[in-house]
Every structure is written in C-alpha cells, then in structure tokens.
Amino acid sequence: MIKQYFKQALSQLKQQPLLTTISVLGTALTICLIMVVVMQQQIKTVPFAPESNRNRLLHVKWMSVGNKTWSDDGSSNGPMGIKTAKGCFEGLKTPEEVSIYSIPGTMQVSLSRGVRTGVDALETDGAFWRIFDFSFIDGKPYSDAETKSGLPVAVITESVARLLFGTATNVAGKEIFVNDAPYRVSGVVKDVSSMASTAYAQIWVPYLSTNITGGDNVWNDGIMGVMQVVILARNSSDFDVIRAECERRRLAYNAGLGDYFVFYRGQPDDQLTMSQRIWANVQPDMAGYFRQQVIIFLILLLVPAINLSSMTHSRLRQRVAEIGVRRSFGATRGGVMGQIVAENLVLTLMAGVVGLLFCLLISYVWGGTLFADSQLMHLNTAPVIEWKMLFKLSTFIYALLF
C-alpha cells in the first residue's frame, strides 16, 4: 500500500510538475528555515562537550555596584573583581562547584622570546576543570593548589600544541613563553569550539599567575574587575536555593563595603537567560524574548502554509474528474480522501528530506556566521561547527509535523 502511495505521488509529480515542485520546495524551505532558527537557539543552550552540564549551570557574567553618595540611578556595571567573586560566591554550600574565571582575552605564546603567536585565553581556577569536561590528549589540568600558589602552568589546545611543538603528544611538562613569561605545559586538550561560549579558549592559565586581579584591572575599591563566575548545581531544581544563598552572601558582603553596595540584576542566570544577557546594566526581558520567538515561528509556519494551501486546492480541482470516476466505480468517500491525504503525506516527507538537505548545506557553508556568538567575534579563531552540536533528530521531526 505504501509503495502504491509513492507511485501515485510520483505520478502526480510527473502530471503536474510545476505545481508539485513548487509545493515540495515551499514545504522544504519552511522546514529548512524552522530548523535553522531552532538551531540558532539550540547552539546557545543544548549541552555539548566541554559544556555538557549546561542544564545545571548558573552564570554571573556581570556585576553592578552603587554608592550611597551617587545619584539614585547611578551605578558602575561590568565584570566583577576577585574580591567580589570570592565574597559573594566562593565556598557556596548548595552547589557542587563554583569557578571564578576571567573574561576572554588574548595572550602571546612562543617557544622563545622571539616570534610570538596570539591565542585566545582564559584565566581560571582549579574548579573550572571539574565543571567542564575537556578531552585531554596529554597531561592533566592544573590543580587547586597550583592555582592558589599562582604557579606559571598552562593548558593548551591541540592546535596550539601542534603550532608550537609540531605534535600534540608528549608535550606536558615542556616550557613555553606566555606574554614573554616562562610557563610549564600542564596538559593538552582537544580543540574547543567557540560556540562553547563559557569554556572556550586556546590557552588556560591560573588567574593568580598574572596581574589580572590587581592594578589597572580593578576599580571601585577592588569591587569591579575582569572576573566572572560559573556555578555547577547538583540538580537544576536547586537553582532557586542557590540564588537565595547568593543573595544572603551579597547582603553580608555589602555590610563590609561602607558606602558601596553590589547588586546582581537578577543573576545568577541559567544558560538561556545568560545567552540573552548582552548588556551589563540591563536585565534581559525573557518574556519579550519568548514572545518574539513565538511570532517568528508563527510567521515561518503561517505564511508558507497560506501560499501552499492555494496550490493544494488547485491540484485537487484538477483531480475532480479522476475522483468522480473512482467514485463511480465503487470507491468510498473515505477511501478516496484517505488516499489523497496519504499522497500529500508522501510529498511532505519528500519535502522534509529536501528541507533537511537544504538545512545541512546552509549550516555547512554559512554555519560560522549563522551560529557565531556575537560577543566572541573578536577572537582569533573561526567558530568550529560540528553536526552533533547542531543537528537533533527531534528538531527535524517537530519541523516536519508542523
């Protein structure tokens, strides 16, 4: 029976090639657009290595500080200083881990004090390596003790190791120069896609091995700086409890700041909210975001559906004579309708396959532009896009059903 439906669908394609082709391509384009839009959102929230725990992560990207002597709406906004990160978040009891790390930056690496290469860098603590699941090719991450001691150790990516040493193995323990300072390579990890917006870098070093926590990198009595915080909950159901604990720590921290006081603007954020928090002084409007997504999907679904329905109506009108003949030879109304529906489902399935191919082609050719994080566009490397990061079978099925 199914084979017969396919034959009849192909027959319709031959009899009405223009209408059928437009119908198939229109449906395919709709499915393609829906999948691309969904994947643009998924890449920000769906777990993939090394951010496999995204569903359990909370983020504090920005901090706001006010002063009792400033105007009512006066505030300084941006990354926090190490003093604030430790005072408000270090040692939280509810979560599994808390990591303090720097905003993305660039460091110069070399094997000598001669020719240097710029690479994307993060400065972290030891907990960072327990939150994110990097794949180590050689060596291991630096420890909490090495971080607290400010030892000059570094983890580098496979591509950086090959650039410096010509190989990614047997590199641990060797010396490199980072911003003209000697560092020991602690480990080598597989290259990380910049789509992993929190974990991504090409080199990671302990934040106490540089001057990033002092000097010109802090202001407002050390309250503000260049640090951020990521929290790994034991379970996503603990998010509200963790936020409440963070609020208690904030109040206790403010008690020792004199005229200054810090506030979170709704943070810590889950992964989705964090992806929409662009500005340090503006809390994201998540209700508006969801409304916008609904409107986009309605437009993507309704406009092609209205156009395609008129084409389907034209096709059916041309088959009125055929339907009349079949009815006169004893075919039931339900049987005729069922066959027409089945034929249209076959055409929809064909369109779905074409739409999937369109989507994969677009993702392959323009993926770096479509899915790049605008906040990381200044980095040295182009975004690495892998199919397993983007394509979910459920996305294709939902797009096909709608």
Where does each model-flagged region fall?
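A short amphipathic helical element positioned immediately N-terminal to and/or at the very start
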Residues: Y5-K14, A85-C88
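Hydrophobic alpha-helical transmembrane segments of multi-pass inner-membrane transport and secretion
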Residues: Q15-K44, Q283-A321, L349
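Transmembrane alpha-helical interface segments in multi-pass membrane proteins
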Residues: L18-L29, A321-G367, S394-Y398
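Membrane-proximal extracellular/periplasmic loop immediately following the first transmembrane helix
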Residues: V37-Q108, I223-Q228, L376-N380, V384
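Short amphipathic beta-strand/extended segments in non-transmembrane regions
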Residues: G78-P141, D259-Y260
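Mid-to-C-terminal secondary-structure elements
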Residues: A127-P141, P152-Q283
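Peri-membrane helix termini and adjoining interfacial loops of integral membrane proteins
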Residues: Q271-T273, V365-T381
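Hydrophobic alpha-helical transmembrane segments of polytopic membrane proteins
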Residues: Q375-F402
